[in-house]
Amino acid sequence: MLFRSKLLKSDAIIQAINAASVIQYMNQNILKKYFENVLGVSSLKIRIGIDFGDDDEVLWSKYGIDNINEVTVTSLHADLSSKLQNKASENSIMVGENVFSYLQLPDDLLSDIYIKGSSEEKDYYIMKHNSFNYKMKNFDWSKYLERIAHFESYEGDFQIKCYYLSENERRIPYYSEKALEKDTDIVYQIEASQSLLHKINSVEWTVSNSGIEASKEEELDYVVPKEAFTDEDNAVFRCKRHTAFNGLHYMICKIKAEGNITKNKYFSLYVNDNDLSKSYLKKAELE
């Protein structure tokens, strides 16, 4: 998959992952039924490969005359994205090492594949060349979308919303389409009809962080302590936090309501320090 834009690098990768995941979702849950039940033919088998190359490892070229031209890219990572696509199984997404390292994706979204014809020997690398051993992972797009709170939200249920504060203290909704900067104040809130909110008996907020920074600080998973909430926070079912670590992080809200109902709601939030993430990139130094 090839994306070229003026977005921040983290946001370009995030939007590539989001686009690929939605493509797979639409194919698996909508197009498949149409092809098989209406058209009476086999459904599409979509394979997607995503990789990322930094500015100094990608050469953009434009060929042609006047308004008849073509933009093309030359890069090891453009070739690797094609190879990743070839490695992908039907209706799956393969990502290169720079993708999951740059965003510090959680381990539970990533898995190894097996060497073709073997059920025991894993295939870790999309490329092995002396000192340049470049890893690949299968990306669990289904689980990823399940944890994006607004993706399959519907009326009549509890919804988790997240807002971040602008410079003028205005609340802006966050939709997992980009990374927030570190030290950004954010607010999670349960939203639903008043009749549904009145049925809530208790709420527990659990932070699930990912990445090298959170691991070093031993703050990967923890329940937000009761003393972190004001009476007003508890009354309106909100949780105030701030961003601190690179990675894709989850807020997990456990809601207990009348009728012996328990629901666990996820919200996915990206945080990225692009300067730090650049140090995670694997550079090709081929002879």
List each language-model region with its residue ranges.
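Intrinsically disordered, glycine/charged-rich C-terminal tails and inter-domain linkers
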Residues: 90-287
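Catalytic beta-strand-to-alpha-helix segment of the class III nucleotidyl cyclase homology domain
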Residues: 6-126, 131-135
